[in-house]
Amino acid sequence: MRATKAATMASGEPSKSTRPSGPAERIRIKRVYATPAKSDGRRILVDRLWPRGMSKERARLSEWMKEIAPSAELRKWFGHDPARWPEFQRRFTAELEGHADDLGRLRDLAQKGRLTLVYAARDEAHNNAVVLREILLGRK
């Protein structure tokens, strides 16, 4: 087992002395309400709406890329209903086809170091950041 993976498994965070090596290690997702960490690297908010009750200081974001978030119509239709997840993934992926420059920029940032896609949804398995990460990793 590589040192980075071992350090991550032991504490949930990579050790400070390790640098992310593979693409999956370089691109993370994290709720905006979770405590920011140095190991997050560049923190990019990928929601269209600003998270409720979150100050800019507390969020500690590098950037807010609302243009890469699902459209208002798609977000409302989905309503974070897990039964709509497969169709949401398909529709959001189709929307992202018009954002090649933004996706390329995120890939470039991930090549330079850790990139954390930050989102506000309560459901950690069914949200736009999950889809976006899969696309950036070339899995969709």
Residue ranges: model-predicted function:
Residues R2-K140:
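Residues lining hydrophobic/aromatic ligand-binding pockets adjacent to catalytic sites
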